[in-house]
């Protein structure tokens, strides 16, 4: 009996998301401190002289930008904390099931299907301005089920290796190579 294959899927906890959330947070706090410096007439930032800005309209607009950036960064940190899009793919030939799980904002999305419904493992590679490298299950009478994460393209060798391993495990052909 073959051991089940459990593939973790990386969601929003990627380095690029952490960097964007950090930069937006720093920028938002900077704008808020600039606005506060303008209002109170004291420099709260070590660079520049934001206390010299006129409160209306410059300090007020800086405060509005700061509030917007802090709200956006709060959303980004919440998405990272929840790990939206993360989950796992579990292939169990012993139980004849495939379980796909992904985290959403408010719930865990999970569905199970029998291994017999899989016609093939599909490798999709599209290069160009918006590259796409995706591994999917082709099902009988239904749409393809994507297995790989959204975002940065996976290395071609890793995609082919993973697709071939999965096709061998499920005893189905590998398409698109």
Swiss-Prot record:
Compartment(s) where it occurs, according to its Swiss-Prot or TrEMBL record: Cellular thylakoid membrane
GO cellular component: photosystem I; plasma membrane-derived thylakoid membrane
Family matches, as InterPro entries: PSI_Ycf4_assembly
NCBIfam families for this protein: PRK02542.1 (NF002712)
Transmembrane segments annotated in the record for this chain: 20-40, 60-80
The entry's keywords: Membrane, Photosynthesis, Thylakoid, Transmembrane, Transmembrane helix
Gene Ontology biological process terms from the UniProt entry: photosynthesis
Family according to the record: Belongs to the Ycf4 family.
Protein name listed in UniProt: Photosystem I assembly protein Ycf4
Name of the gene this protein is made from: ycf4
Function noted in UniProt: Seems to be required for the assembly of the photosystem I complex.
Membrane topology field: Multi-pass membrane protein
């Amino acid at each position: 009996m073959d051991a089940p294959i459990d593939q973790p899927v990386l969601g929003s906890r990627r380095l690029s998301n952490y960097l964007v959330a950090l930069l937006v947070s720093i920028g938002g706090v900077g704008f808020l401190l600039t606005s506060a410096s303008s209002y109170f007439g004291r420099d709260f930032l070590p660079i520049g002289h934001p206390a010299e800005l006129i409160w209306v309209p410059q300090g007020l607009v800086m405060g509005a930008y700061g509030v917007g950036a802090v709200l956006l960064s709060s959303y980004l940190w919440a998405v990272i904390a929840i790990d939206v899009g993360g989950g796992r793919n579990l292939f169990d030939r012993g139980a004849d099931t495939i379980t796909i799980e992904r985290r959403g904002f408010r719930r865990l999305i999970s569905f199970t299907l029998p291994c017999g419904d899989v016609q093939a493992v599909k490798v999709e590679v599209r290069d160009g301005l918006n590259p796409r490298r995706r591994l999917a299950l082709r099902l009988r009478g239904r749409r393809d089920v994507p297995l790989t994460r959204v975002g940065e393209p996976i290395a071609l060798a890793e995609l082919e290796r993973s697709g071939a391993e999965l096709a061998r495990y499920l005893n189905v052909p590998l398409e698109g190579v």
